[in-house]
Amino acid sequence: MAKTEQDRLKKEAAEKAASMVKSGMILGVGTGSTVAFFIDALGKRKDNDGLKLKAIVTTSNRSKNQLEGLGFKVSELADVDQVDLTVDGSDRVADNLDGIKGGGGALTLEKNVAINSKKIIWIVDESKLVHRLGGFPLPVEVLPISCEQNFKRFKQEGLKPQWRMDSDKRYITHYGNYIIDLAADPVPAPHGLADYLDHTVGVVEHGLFLDMCDEVIIAHSDGTIEDKIK
């Protein structure tokens, strides 16, 4: 799919999601190229419809800067009550609405916002859809002190670990940690793998977002917009 066509689909899905935001909400805003279109659509709603939000929290400085550039005030997650709605993208979405996220490296904050949200909507184009989770590296954020042992253990488990790189150096997250991308495809037993990672010393967070998403807005190449609701 050509990038211009993919961007058109992302914009359509983002505008659909923006139409569902209501004044007075505490809104969570995610990270990524699709979310950038969503933020632009929010700005238009503020200017044209008088949209006024109680608070906004974001999962990246990129989204924060874009929102502030459009006149929105951005709060810290710790300073708000439960988030009413979070709109985010997803790197892959399975038939049951489970997802892989964190391709941009912000998985820890993304998950913290998600678990503090009453409702979660993901906006994607059809290229992100899979029957079973896979087709995209699964990011695992790890502490530097234990990262080498984590890498060896993941390799022994057959999870095909790879270091996330930034040019010729290991990628460093917002929290000063490293990311190990697991290339096992498809993801073996997602719930079992999530439990394994949750109980592995040195793992800060992983990109399996299971039983979290309530709705996915999908832009298809034929121009249709599909709503999938759990």
From Swiss-Prot:
InterPro entries assigned to the protein according to its UniProt record, in alphabetical order: NagB/RpiA_transferase-like, Ribose5P_isomerase_typA_subgr, Ribose5P_isomerase_type_A
GO biological process, one term: D-ribose metabolic process
Residue stretches in coiled coil: none
Active site residues per record: E110 (proton acceptor)
Primary enzyme class: isomerase
Disulfide bonds listed in the record: none
Binding-site residues, substrate: T31, G32, S33, T34, D88, G89, S90, D91, K101, G102, G103, G104, K128
Role this protein plays: Catalyzes the reversible conversion of ribose-5-phosphate to ribulose 5-phosphate.
Complex formation: Homodimer.
Protein name, as recorded: Ribose-5-phosphate isomerase A
Taxonomic source organism: Lactobacillus helveticus (strain DPC 4571)
Record lineage: Bacteria, Bacillati, Bacillota, Bacilli, Lactobacillales
